[in-house]
Structure formats: structure tokens, C-alpha cells
């Protein structure tokens, strides 16, 4: 008996592949990073089998490349992610996110009294690594939160 090894998610000719996203996080990344605000084809694989992770999510975006800042902002959600740059169906670049000093225009402050909810300002958080956590400090209300609190918001 032979087993055919098939791609579970179709290959792309040119663009970005975000691999090794923890299961159940793929849709959150699409929404937070506004990755769907494009006319390019996006392919999503959810709960795919992974030798390393058990299950994983995967996002492929054709003709779109993430900036270094965008890649680093993934570190909060998918620290083990791999971001592959594809050209002519080949991986031409590979990077992993590293925790940035700031995250702008992505998150929402969990403090309901924060001015960022009432004024037309872009969100901005300073990122600080702690022993077993990552702290995010809002630029406007100056309150500090565990990254899990901000991500759940």
C-alpha cells in the first residue's frame, strides 16, 4: 500500500506563508493584522497536523509580503511561527518573529476608561518581557497589562 503525500494547503507562486501558528490563532491573526483587507487570494489551514505542535494553523497570502515590524508583532501570538517569503513557488526567505519594543495599530487597550476608546488615535503599547509573561503598557492611559489580558480583549 502506498501513501500519496499531498499538500494539505495549495502552494502559492509568490507571497507570504505564515507557518507554525498555534491552533485556533489563525483567524485572530487575520483579523488583528487586517490581512483580509486585500484583493489577493488568502488560503487558511486550520488545525493541520504538525509533528512539533500536534496541531497548527497556516496562512498563505499571495502577492503580499509582511514588513519586518509585522513579522515581529506576530511574536505575541505565535512566537514559534515561521514566516516564509515565496517567489516562483520557492522559499527565498525565512524569518521568525522576535518580540518588538512597541506594537502599534494592532491591539485594543483593555482599560475601558482609556482615551484611545473615545478619540481617533492609533493604539500603541510598549512591550516588556517578564519572567513568565509579556507586559504591554498603553501609551495613553499608561496602564500595564499581561499580554493575555490584551489579547483576549
Swiss-Prot record:
Entry annotated with the keyword Metal-binding: yes
Keyword Glycoprotein applies: no
CC cofactor note: Binds 1 zinc ion per subunit.
Xref: Pfam families: PyrI, PyrI_C
GO cellular component terms given for this protein: aspartate carbamoyltransferase complex; cytoplasm
GO molecular function: zinc ion binding
Record-listed Zn(2+) binding positions: 109, 114, 138, 141
GO process terms (BP): 'de novo' pyrimidine nucleobase biosynthetic process; pyrimidine nucleotide biosynthetic process
Cofactor: Zn(2+)
InterPro entries reported in the protein's UniProt record: Asp_carbamoyltransf_reg_N, Asp_carbamoylTrfase_reg, Asp_carbamoyltrfase_reg_C, Asp_carbatrfase_reg_C_sf, Asp_carbatrfase_reg_N_sf
UniProt KW keywords: Metal-binding, Pyrimidine biosynthesis, Zinc
Function: Involved in allosteric regulation of aspartate carbamoyltransferase.
Subunit structure: Heterododecamer (2C3:3R2) of six catalytic PyrB chains organized as two trimers (C3), and six regulatory PyrI chains organized as three dimers (R2).
Family: Belongs to the PyrI family.
Stated name of the protein: Aspartate carbamoyltransferase regulatory chain
